């Protein structure tokens, strides 16, 4: 069943940006490169099936207080190549790009209004970082009543334990549907 812009489903691709994906990037997340092939296939499938594909992208001002407060190096500074979606996953006509300045794709953005405007109630979240922007976007999606799914094949974390913790929190606390890789178990409740 095709749902797309008139229907019920969206694929939300979070922060698959040059400054997170490229080797040597300011905030490199090496695991992002491991998920690229599967995520590329998932994006193609979403487009083919009529799902709305939304890219939620970190976009900081050069003097963003997050850098000093959190100790992050400057990254995804608006207008720089580092803030662009990695070329192999580049948005296509019909896809939507939403810029964010915080960890959540919903906080201070138009994402909720965009999704509601398209009648979308079901989201699959993909991208990075599992224990930061995926977790906080999933939390806000759940609090807004979306049916959210996170498939472990399409998300990357900074460290295996933080990645696993975030998946457990999304599933056990937020009610997000988490699709585990083979051999991985859901947390006990």
List the model feature ranges, each with a label.
Residues 1-10, 38-49, 73-189:
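Active-site-adjacent betaalpha module
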Residues 7, 25-58:
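A short alpha/beta connector and helix-capping loop motif
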Residues 10-17:
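Acidic-leg catalytic submotif of subtilisin-like serine proteases
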Residues 14, 57, 152:
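Active-site flanking residues adjacent to catalytic metal/cofactor-binding acidic residues
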Residues 18, 22:
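Short, glycine/acidic-enriched loop or turn micro-motifs at the edges of active sites
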Residues 57-59, 128-129:
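Short, well-ordered beta-to-alpha junction loops that form the rim of enzyme active sites
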Residues 59-62, 155-156:
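Solvent-exposed loop/turn segments at secondary-structure junctions
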Residues 64-69:
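Metal-dependent catalytic neighborhoods of phosphoester/phosphodiester hydrolases
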């Amino acid at each position: 069943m095709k749902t797309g812009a008139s229907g019920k489903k969206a694929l939300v691709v979070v922060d698959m940006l040059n400054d997170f994906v490229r080797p040597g990037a300011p905030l490199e997340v090496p695991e992002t490169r491991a998920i690229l092939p599967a995520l590329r296939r998932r994006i193609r499938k979403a487009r083919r099936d009529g799902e709305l594909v939304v890219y939620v992208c970190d976009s900081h001002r050069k003097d963003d207080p997050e850098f000093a407060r959190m100790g992050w190096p400057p990254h995804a500074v608006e207008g720089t190549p580092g803030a662009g979606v990695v070329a192999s996953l580049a948005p296509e006509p019909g896809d939507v790009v939403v810029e964010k300045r915080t960890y959540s794709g919903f906080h201070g953005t138009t994402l909720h209004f965009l999704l509601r405007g398209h009648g979308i109630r079901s989201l699959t979240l993909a991208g990075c970082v599992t224990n930061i922007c995926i977790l906080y976007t999933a939390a806000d999606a759940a609090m807004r009543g979306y049916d959210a799914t996170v498939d472990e094949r399409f998300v990357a974390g900074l460290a295996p334990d933080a990645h696993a913790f975030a998946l457990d929190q999304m599933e056990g606390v937020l009610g997000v549907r988490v699709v585990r890789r083979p051999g991985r178990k859901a947390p006990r409740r």
